[in-house]
Curated annotation (Swiss-Prot):
Protein name, per record: tRNA-specific 2-thiouridylase MnmA
GO CC term, one of those recorded: cytoplasm
Cellular location(s): Cytoplasm
Family label: Belongs to the MnmA/TRMU family.
Pfam family membership, one: tRNA_Me_trans
Residues with site note (Interaction with tRNA): H144, Q354
UniProt keyword list: ATP-binding, Cytoplasm, Disulfide bond, Nucleotide-binding, RNA-binding, Transferase, tRNA processing, tRNA-binding
């Protein structure tokens, strides 16, 4: 099986029973299957689950978010079923400050944030790596659908082979040092194959549905989450046309995102879209679809993973949203920013706060945040 071939390379040249692996267990099918399989074939497995928000005591089973209270119990249940060590680490304070509050502040600035990237960058990789080192393990394995390939140029991050499950967009901020230590056993599998393996192993939660929502939103609107941290966030303001004409009013910029068409409550003979959010002046600017079209953008805080130097004019494929197709682009370093010139109009709106991830084929070259 392809999974076995991948697992066999966790630490090349070492017997399975001589390798200690920490598995980041979210309580879902994917990471539970990784932990169960590694344990079954002989690895010394330690499962670690992060308690990220204060619903730990909840045992609801119909939640469709990751890291819910019931997920922690599921992770503990799988560890008990297979007989390996499992720890729960309380990271609520860090998660609140670095993920939830960052999410709220980003929306207040008129951006459209991607909290899952921030979560992976901070508590799920940076802090899990510290825990792994403290436990003196040889590697940290996760249930992400990406691939880690060792080449003559070093370790590289690649897309998972299943396009519908590939999570490389959310992991662009992984560092080279982290990649040396991380393992992604599911990168060569389709989701259906993972679930089949879970059934074959008789994992208790093999039929558990996938998580779909942002974990801390939990059925609420994004605005509800933001208002919890900033009660003053919902201030009424003007909706203007691109020509400066007042078309209506809004009930807070936090309710809008670039490219949004529905919910504007405007009477117009043609469809109008949000083309700009001026959060500082509390103004929403709308226009026709062509006003969204642009062929260049700037990116900040670039994490460059490729071993080759980032030079002006480098050709690559660019992904501007997690569910969007890639578009051919050219990269031009510009001081602290990176200019990205696109060969064609992207099908999605370019929104500040979203991640821009660059690829060469399946390889992740790097990425950053759209400004």
């Amino acid at each position: 099986m392809k999974l076995m071939q991948e697992l066999a390379e966790i630490i090349p040249g070492k017997a399975y029973n001589d390798v200690k692996v920490m598995v980041a267990m979210s309580g879902g099918v994917d990471s539970s299957t990784v932990a169960a399989y590694l344990h079954r074939v002989g690895y010394k497995v330690i499962g670690v689950t992060l308690q990220l928000h204060n619903n730990f005591t909840s045992t609801q089973t119909n939640r469709k978010t990751c890291c819910a209270g019931s997920d922690i119990f599921d992770a503990k249940r799988v560890a008990a079923q297979f007989g390996f060590l499992h720890y729960v680490v309380n990271m609520e304070e860090t998660f609140r400050k670095e993920v939830i509050e960052n999410f709220a502040e980003s929306y207040l600035k008129g951006e459209t944030p991607v909290p899952c990237v921030k979560c992976n960058q901070t508590v799920k990789f940076r802090d899990l790596m510290k825990i792994a080192k403290s436990l003196s393990v040889d590697a940290l394995a996760t249930g992400h659908y990406v691939r880690r390939l060792t080449t003559t140029n070093g370790v590289e991050l690649h897309k998972g082979i299943d396009p519908s499950k590939d999570q490389s967009y959310f992991l662009f901020n992984t560092t080279r040092e982290q990649l040396e230590f991380l393992r992604f056993p599911l990168g060569n599998l389709k989701k259906s194959e993972t679930r089949d393996l879970a059934r074959k192993l008789s994992v208790d939660i093999s039929e558990k549905p996938e998580s779909q929502d942002i974990c801390f939103v939990n059925g609420k609107s994004y605005a509800d989450v933001i208002k919890k941290f900033r009660p003053d966030a919902q201030r009424p303001g003007k909706i203007l046309s691109t020509d400066g004409e007042v078309l209506g009013t809004h009930n807070g910029t936090i309710h809008y995102t670039i490219g949004q068409r529905h919910g504007l409550q405007l009477s117009a003979p043609i469809p109008l879209y949000v083309v700009k959010i001026d959060a500082q002046n509390n103004i929403i600017i709308v226009g026709t679809r062509d006003k969204l079209q642009q062929r260049s953008l700037y990116v900040k805080e670039v994490n460059w993973l490729d071993r080759k130097e980032l030079t002006a004019g480098l050709e690559c494929e660019v992904k501007l949203r997690s569910g969007a197709d890639t578009v051919k682009g050219y990269l031009y370093p510009n001081g602290e920013l990176l200019k990205v010139s696109l060969a064609e109009e992207p099908k999605c709106a370019i929104a500040p706060g979203q991640a821009c991830v660059m690829y060469h084929g399946s390889k992740v070259l790097g990425g950053g945040w759209i400004v």
